[in-house]
Amino acid sequence: MVTIITLSLLLLSVSLSLGGGLYEVLIVYPNWKYNVEPHTLRAKLESSGQMNSGKRFWPLVSPAQGLLSIINIILAWNYTGEAHNYWLAAAITIFVNRLITFAYFIPEMLRKIMQPEQVEATRLQAIVRRWTALSPWRLLPEIVSWGLLIAALIRLR
């Protein structure tokens, strides 16, 4: 029972993260990633909803997903059934994705993009261009993990 609950919670967190990430990439980023200037970026972040998601959605989803991935790695590691490989691969993939997010994406967003007045214009443009180009790639491991978690859940006995 614990295995089904923890695997399902990880699947839920991946679903939320995947949905939020897709929404940001398709709807939110285009509203602030172009014509980046230190004196206007903060207003663009506010009006696009990026500031709110960075303060209200991601601080809940990302740490929960990281913690759930660790718990699921431990449970999947010790699980001997048919779901083992799918479950473990998904949990490790999500954990690595969270590590990358916490090591690069969150610090860049908080220290530079959300505080644009402190960064020189040319440098800020390069930071935003790189960040918005790399960020969508985080969705690929989440899509793969989502599929692996579904496969694991089907095979769980």
Model-derived regions: residue spans:
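Juxtamembrane boundary at the C-terminal end of a transmembrane helix
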Residues: 150-157
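Interfacial segments of alpha-helical transmembrane regions
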Residues: 2-15, 75-96
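Hydrophobic residues within alpha-helical transmembrane segments
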Residues: 12, 63, 92, 137-140
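Core segments of transmembrane alpha-helices
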Residues: 59-73, 139-147
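Eukaryotic polytopic
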Residues: 128-135
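Interfacial loop at the N-terminal end of multi-pass membrane proteins
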Residues: 3-69, 110-128
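Mid-bilayer segments of alpha-helical transmembrane spans in multi-pass integral membrane proteins
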Residues: 95-103
